[in-house]
C-alpha cells in the first residue's frame, strides 16, 4: 500500500500518541479511499474491492456526521484540509 500511515497520524493527531481520534480516523479513511479510487482507474472490474470501498465511504460518512455534531470547528477545518466538500 502506498499510504504512509505514520505521516497521516502525525499530521492529524491532537497530541502525541493520538491514533484513534475522529480526525485521525477520517484522514486515514480518506487516504485509503483515494488509493482505492486510483486502483479502480485501471481495474474497472474489481467488484470485490469496490464493495470494500463503499464500506469505507460509509464509515467515513458516519464519523464525519459524529464530528459535525460534536465539534463544528474541527469538522469544518478537517473538511477544508482534506478537500472533501466544496
Swiss-Prot record:
HAMAP family xref list: Ribosomal_uS15_B (MF_01343_B)
Xref: InterPro entries: Ribosomal_uS15, Ribosomal_uS15_bac-type, uS15_NS1_RNA-bd_sf
Keywords: Ribonucleoprotein, Ribosomal protein, RNA-binding, rRNA-binding
Assembly, per entry: Part of the 30S ribosomal subunit. Forms a bridge to the 50S subunit in the 70S ribosome, contacting the 23S rRNA.
Biological process according to GO: translation
Record carries keyword Ribonucleoprotein: yes
Source organism: Vesicomyosocius okutanii subsp. Calyptogena okutanii (strain HA)
Signal peptide location: none
Record protein name field: Small ribosomal subunit protein uS15
